Amino acid sequence: MTKRRVVVGMSGGVDSSVTAWLLKEQGYDVVGLFMKNWEDDDDGEYCSTRQDWIDVVSVADLIGIDVEAVNFAAEYKDRVFAEFLREYSAGRTPNPDVLCNAEIKFKAFLDHAMSLGAQTIATGHYARVRERDGRFELLKAFDHTKDQSYFLHRLNQAQLSKTMFPLGEIPKTRVREIAAQIGLPNAKKKDSTGICFIGERPFRDFLNRYLPTKPGPMKTPDGKTVGEHIGLAFYTFGQRKGIGLGGSKDGSGEPWFVAAKDIASNTLYVVQGHDHPWLRSRELVAGNVSWVAGEPPADGARCGAKTRYRQADAPCAFGRAAQAGDERFSLVFDEPQWAVTPGQSAVLYDGDVCLGGGIIESAATGRAGTAPAGRAPALVEAR
């Protein structure tokens, strides 16, 4: 009887290595595939591609599977990095990991795996896939502290039908134990952090390689100039570090936070205090939508939503756009949400089931969910 072939995306990390071992133990014909999505453009101080490949080969030798490398750098720059730069240039803060999953790991990678004769692909993501009544659902991992469904919310039925997440029902601590027990050479390797193509390098330094600085005024909500910024692209909503302001003598003395961007006047608005009303939003509008089931929730449906990774699901009401053909949606939260950021993803849940989501375009702020009087009219909002 021919074994079912599964191509596993192997990064050199512990999670994908244990994934490959588990599937091999379950009797699958496992092939490892290492993706190179970024061409190293420095001396290797920050990029770990070479060492990651060495780790993949070592793991494959230990567990007895074939492995190959594939270069998706061109696809990544066209489909992910170009959009990343466009969003930052427009003053928004994108999440390239969400787009990378949809366009590279579960599209280019999936297509390549099928060409290798695979029936299914698998990755080391912490999430689950469940088939119910002929449809596929994306669920949170049992270990909610490691759940990565937020980054996977743009996957569709075709992609989910060919995907396995073996770690979705295993706690991270157990994954580490398995790695040690079977003697994986990378058992003690640290989890990767940060955006994949940036590595551990300072983010502002990286971004400045591709986007020019464009200094402008830094103002408070009442219009007082308190400093100068280096370019709106280099700041994100809710940012505290790197603003260059201490507690002003005539202010509250509390820390400063980025609260808004006025693209037309190249002005960065900052406020003092974590609980300032400009940092709180009761409503948002999101576009560029993607629904796991292929269609949105019912208008007025109650759901939970995340506007950033690892945030607790916030209870809210879902609203469809009133105009026909407009796929955007709105969310009205039961409680104000902190630093809702245009460019980030608003991801919806019904309990453990991920429904999908969209890219945040705008968020209403203020004491009652509306913009405070005197706020600049051309803030980063709708595309």
Curated annotation (Swiss-Prot):
Subcellular location, record wording: Cytoplasm
Segments for region (Interaction with target base in tRNA): 95-97
GO molecular function: ATP binding; tRNA binding; tRNA-uridine 2-sulfurtransferase activity
S-S pairs: C100-C196
An individual GO BP term: tRNA wobble position uridine thiolation
Main location: cytoplasm
Keywords (A to Z) from UniProt: ATP-binding, Cytoplasm, Disulfide bond, Nucleotide-binding, RNA-binding, Transferase, tRNA processing, tRNA-binding
Record field: transmembrane: none
Active site residues of this protein: C100 (nucleophile), C196 (cysteine persulfide intermediate)
Site positions (Interaction with tRNA): H125, Q344
SUPFAM superfamilies: Adenine nucleotide alpha hydrolases-like (SSF52402)
Catalytic reaction equation(s): S-sulfanyl-L-cysteinyl-[protein] + uridine(34) in tRNA + AH2 + ATP = 2-thiouridine(34) in tRNA + L-cysteinyl-[protein] + A + AMP + diphosphate + H(+)
Cellular component, GO annotation: cytoplasm
Record region (Interaction with tRNA): 146-148, 308-309
Pfam families associated with the record: tRNA_Me_trans (PF03054), tRNA_Me_trans_C (PF20258), tRNA_Me_trans_M (PF20259)
Its job: Catalyzes the 2-thiolation of uridine at the wobble position (U34) of tRNA, leading to the formation of s(2)U34.
HAMAP family per the UniProt record, alphabetical: tRNA_thiouridyl_MnmA
Entry protein name: tRNA-specific 2-thiouridylase MnmA
The encoding gene: mnmA
